[in-house]
């Protein structure tokens, strides 16, 4: 069985590298690290990851929620938001994209891996077909 593909979208390089190392150690294939929404959309279009680990506040014009919205126009990967934001407006916008989970930083690495496993299991073969 091929390893599940995960795109890490995080503008803090140190955090992104730590997440990438943990994911690789757990047997996942990290398709890339994106620091901007534009880079996330481009990476997802070419690699079709099974899951997006998405920060909300990113460098550039597009935040993580908008990036997920654009990616979901093409196909429906599982989504886990990993962010420091927890205000009601941001959470409402994020929940409209139907993520599997919304983890607030700092988070326990074990919890992240549990959420990833559950999201991939619930999404069936890794990614759901695009909605009409």
What residue ranges belong to the model's regions?
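Acidic, metal-coordinating helix/loop segments flanking the phosphotransfer/catalytic sites
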Residues: 20, 33-51
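Acidic catalytic/metal-coordinating carboxylates
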Residues: 36, 62-66
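Alpha4 helix (beta4-alpha4-beta5 surface) of REC/receiver domains from two-component response regulators
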Residues: 86-104, 114
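C-terminal output helix
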Residues: 89, 107-117, 124
């Amino acid at each position: 069985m091929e390893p599940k593909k995960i795109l890490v979208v995080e503008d803090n390089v140190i955090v992104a590298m730590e997440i990438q190392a943990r994911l690789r150690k757990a047997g996942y294939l990290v398709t890339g690290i994106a620091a901007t929404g534009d880079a996330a959309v481009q990476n997802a279009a070419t690699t079709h990851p099974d899951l997006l680990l998405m920060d909300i506040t990113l460098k550039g014009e597009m935040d993580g929620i908008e990036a997920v919205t654009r990616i979901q126009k093409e196909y429906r990967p599982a989504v886990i938001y990993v962010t420091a934001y927890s205000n009601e407006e941001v959470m409402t916008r994020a929940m409209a994209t139907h993520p599997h989970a919304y983890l607030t930083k700092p988070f326990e690495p074990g919890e992240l891996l549990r959420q990833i496993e559950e999201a991939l299991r619930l999404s069936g073969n890794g990614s759901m077909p695009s909605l009409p």
